[in-house]
Amino acid sequence: MEIQFHGKTALVTGAGSGIGEAIALDLAAAGATVVVADLKQEAAQKVADRIAAQGGKAAAVSGNVADPEVVKAQVAAAMANGGLHLLVNNAGIGGPSAPTGDYPLDGWNQVIGVNLNAVFYGLRFGIPAMLQSGGGAIVNMASILGSVGFANAPAYVAAKHAVVGLTKTAAQEYATQGIRINAVGPAFIDTPLLSDFDEAARNWLIAKHPAGRLGRAAEVSALVLFLLSGQAGFITGSYHLVDGGYTAL
C-alpha cells in the first residue's frame, strides 16, 4: 500500500541537509505540505525550493531550536499552512569529543539544548497544535546511542537516551487522544555530518556495522514515513533502530 499524506501538514526540524532533508523531500513527494526548518534560512529555503520545483508545497523557517520561542514559531508556521498533523523532531548536533571527566560544560549545555531540550519543546508546543488539528503522528530522532554507550560522547549519549524515555512517556499520555509518538535510532548514516571524517575514521565506523557499510538517509526516511502513516496505526511509544546490525554485536 502506497503511503500518502495529502491534506496533511508536516514540520521537520534539521531539514536543511542529511536525514532531515530526505524526510522533508519524501513527505512532500507523498503529498504533505512541509514546513522545512533549519538553523540556517538559506539551507531551509533550498530544500523548500526543491520541493516546489517538484510540484510540492513547502515553507522555509529557521532558527536555533534550543530556543523555545523558535520552536513555538515553527509550530505556528505549520498551523498557518493548514495545521500540524506530522512532526519530526530531527535537529541534532554531535558536540565535543572528550571523556566525561574532561567534558566542557558549555559543550554539554549546547548538546543537551539541541538534542534533548528542542525535542521537548517540539512536543510541548507541537502536541497542543496537533490536538487542535485533529491528531497526528510524531517521530523523535534518537540514535543507536539511545540504547548503548559511546566513549567520549557523554552529552550526545545522555540526550539520546533521554529522547527515548521522553518518547515513551509522551506516547502513553496521548495514545487515546489521536496522537502517536515514536522514536527512530539510526546508526552512522552517510550524511554531511560525516564530511570531516577521513578515510581511516570512516572505515573504523563501517567496521562497527555488520552490514559492512554506513546507512543511507533514504533508509531512515523510509522508516520515518511508515511510522507517520496510518499503516503504523497501532505503533506508539516504540524505539525503532536503523543500524545495519550495529547493536546486534
Which residues fall in each region the model found?
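The beta1-alpha1 cofactor-binding region of Rossmann-like NAD(H)/NADP(H)-dependent oxidoreductases
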Residues: 41-42, 62-73, 105, 218-219
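Substrate-binding pocket helix/loop in short-chain dehydrogenase/reductase
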Residues: 98-100, 104-112, 194, 205
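Active-site helix of classical SDR
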Residues: 123, 159, 167
